[in-house]
Amino acid sequence: MAPVGVEKKLLLGPNGPAVAAAGDLTSEEEEGQSLWSSILSEVSTRARSKLPSGKNILVFGEDGSGKTTLMTKLQGAEHGKKGRGLEYLYLSVHDEDRDDHTRCNVWILDGDLYHKGLLKFAVSAESLRETLVIFVADMSRPWTIMESLQKWASVLREHIDKMKIPPEEMRDLERKFMKDFQDYIEPEEGCQGSPQRRGPLTSGSDEDNVALPLGDNVLTHNLGIPVLVVCTKCDAVSILEKEHDYRDEHLDFIQAHLRGFCLQYGAALIYTSVKEEKNLDLLYKYIVHKTYGFHFTIPALVVEKDAVFIPAGWDNEKKIAILHENFTTVKPEDAYEDFIVKPPVRKLVHDKELAAEDEQVFLMKQQESPARGPSGSPRTQGRGGPASVPSASPGTSVKKPDPNIKNNAASEGVLASFFNSLLSKKTGSPGSPSAGGVQSTAKKSGTEGEPQSFRSLTEQCCQTGQKTVLSNVQEELDRMTRKPDSMVTNSSTENEA
């Protein structure tokens, strides 16, 4: 079918119509070709457009809060090595519509404030507009959350001020961020939009999207860049309920303060758990949504107490006030640390109970204990005698409470018997004029006709158990024997004369 313009030309006459129709046909073809060329050019331009590079994620958090483990999990690695100072890794981003890949830089600052000067290597004045900030809070230690968030927010604010960004440029960043916060539109239920398709998610015309005024406590600390508050280790909520008697009121109080902080900075709030892999996919999608503009179709989640998600721009003070209705023992204006109290530390008492004696001291005591006598007196040993000699009395025991007194008395008795027997032996020999008197004395002492040898005396001494007497008895007997012999010889000579 010929174009309408050509049909009108044919009605003009028999000569000119053919020429006119050919000229109009050529112009129409050129117009069509230019239209197709513009369409193809636009498509090819979009196809050649790549995901922007140079995007940064800056992560703050205390030591042990799980920030490195969280980002390593988002990266797809199973185990990450803990660094020192300023850690670096990257997230792989894939645009399925354009089959394009890029990498998003991730900088993790050490939990020690000593390393905050390293931020200048991660974010500069030129790269600030391409940066997203993540504050990591440890839900297993909720009493540290608010203090930690305030501390790291102050560190970031101080770093931005040191960049000396021109005031007009900083105001542009703040206005753009405030507009994004106000233009938030909650995704409709059943929305089937591709989460990878790039572009703003809008509904209706621009005239319908009227920016609502901000509340009194909303965006009071506008940093000009998107902020994300991520609570890690949310699986510890059950432990808090069992060990620290946390109730729903405590959890609502914590959530209310977190959402209040997020309102001040225009931040989003996400509860995560690497252990249970909870909300990790949601966190990744929200990050690429805020950094690369991918469509995001997940609404706010406030039902589950350990899987909360509050996107930036959704919350307000009236929604937070719903949590206040469940407060019974605390008021919304009460200080956070007055209700979420740090549990007492019982480490000192625990260490005192487990204190052990030094191994070397214990071995020294064990080495010294066998050397002590049964009653504490030092042990003495005879010349060749045994270590202990039983007493002659069958009814007495070897160990006595105080054997010194009895041993001394026995020693004196042995010496007296020895001297008497010695005198009776020497003076009672045949031919002695005084033999009768001496023998009578010997009879009284019960030693007549029974000469006692040194062996019998030694055996008698052994029966007493006195090692001191045993060791010196031989010398004493020799000395005493020589002296009475001389006395008896002199006495016999005088009698004969």
From Swiss-Prot:
Sites of Phosphoserine modification: S194, S369, S377, S429, S432
GO molecular function, one term: identical protein binding
Main location (coarse class): cytoplasm
A Pfam family: DLIC
Disulfide bonds, paired cysteine numbers: none
Residues given in the record as ATP binding sites: G61, E62, D63, G64, S65, G66, K67, T68
Domain of life: Eukaryota
Biased composition (Basic and acidic residues): 476-485
Keywords: ATP-binding, Cytoplasm, Cytoskeleton, Dynein, Methylation, Microtubule, Motor protein, Nucleotide-binding, Phosphoprotein, Transport
Biased composition (Polar residues): 423-444, 487-497
Subunit (UniProt): Homodimer. The cytoplasmic dynein 1 complex consists of two catalytic heavy chains (HCs) and a number of non-catalytic subunits presented by intermediate chains (ICs), light intermediate chains (LICs) and light chains (LCs); the composition seems to vary in respect to the IC, LIC and LC composition. The heavy chain homodimer serves as a scaffold for the probable homodimeric assembly of the respective non-catalytic subunits. The ICs and LICs bind directly to the HC dimer and the LCs assemble on the IC dimer. Self-associates.
Function summary: Acts as one of several non-catalytic accessory components of the cytoplasmic dynein 1 complex that are thought to be involved in linking dynein to cargos and to adapter proteins that regulate dynein function. Cytoplasmic dynein 1 acts as a motor for the intracellular retrograde motility of vesicles and organelles along microtubules. May play a role in binding dynein to membranous organelles or chromosomes.
Family matches, as PANTHER family: CYTOPLASMIC DYNEIN 1 LIGHT INTERMEDIATE CHAIN 2 (PTHR12688:SF1), DYNEIN LIGHT INTERMEDIATE CHAIN (PTHR12688)
Name listed for the protein in its UniProt record: Cytoplasmic dynein 1 light intermediate chain 2
Organism encoding this protein: Rattus norvegicus
